[in-house]
Amino acid sequence: MKKRLLIIVGPTAVGKTDTSIILAKELNGEIISADSMQIYRYMDIGTAKPNEEEKKGIPHHLIDIVNPDEEFSVAEFQKIAKNHINRLIEDEKLPIVAGGTGLYINSLIYDMDFTQSISNWELRGALEAEAREKGNEYVYNKLKQIDPHAAARIHPNNLKKVIRAIEVYEETGEKIGDFSTDLNINQEYDVFFVGLTRDREELYDRINMRVDAMIEQGLIEEVKNLLSLGYDKNLIAFKGLGYKEIIGYLEGAYSLEEAMDILKRDTRRYAKRQLTWFRRYENIHWYNLSNYDSCENLAECILKDFKGHFNSL
């Protein structure tokens, strides 16, 4: 018998946290976060982590597991998340995976083998040096020659992704896009897959209000504290939404109002990319929260469909 798994995805600020907590209470579940920013300690406000009161006594896993200067790969997520899933099933609890990081979700629903890590630090260093000496465009043109399809999808100034695509090609002879297609569904789990969305204007309003709330809650102080602890502003963790904008403000690159406007704009764009990613999934049950009075009413509908799915097997 396959292991039952509930997965909840959707764009940032849509209501995944509240919905997943309600469902966890009703289904005797625990939550496994699939958010690549909530893994970091000391980064709470900018990552919208639920506090203890908001968790309502529901255990949450894969939150606060590494420091901001530590690396954490999709492979590591997959390993730890599966360990939690298997333990919860043994304890007769329902694992509920909730989050908006598409690669994390892919690692659970597809048969993705990370045993052979694709990396070439020497090549990476050489490409970074070339970018410093000759500019990002020079390195980008290398990618265009070997993988024009990837180049068309990556901005020339997104040096990290440009180098990664070159690195994968040089190490495997395969184009990076080939690793995200023709994936086989993981037969280990019987997944009830939930996708949450809202009407666009409502979602964008929620994003704007979330940014305002983050500033009021102390996001600027949180960033200052991280820097005072000695964490380098160039760390991957600081590339996340909310942190890079506030660092720009602190360095005088723009005013606080400008930083907030940039953060709101970039978060809206990120939400759009998330929806594009999740809409590629098959067998996903979509729910528009704009059609419900509350997350509680939505949860009732999801519960009915969830039980119907497994009763029909």
UniProtKB/Swiss-Prot annotation:
Cofactor(s) essential for the protein: Mg(2+)
Binding site for ATP: 10-17
Keywords: ATP-binding, Magnesium, Nucleotide-binding, Transferase, tRNA processing
Reaction it catalyzes: adenosine(37) in tRNA + dimethylallyl diphosphate = N(6)-dimethylallyladenosine(37) in tRNA + diphosphate
Molecular-function GO terms, alphabetical: ATP binding; tRNA dimethylallyltransferase activity
Site residues (Interaction with substrate tRNA), renumbered to this chain: 101, 124
UniProt GO BP: tRNA modification
Its biological purpose: Catalyzes the transfer of a dimethylallyl group onto the adenine at position 37 in tRNAs that read codons beginning with uridine, leading to the formation of N6-(dimethylallyl)adenosine (i(6)A).
Assembly information from the UniProt record: Monomer.
The protein, known as: tRNA dimethylallyltransferase
Gene giving rise to this polypeptide: miaA
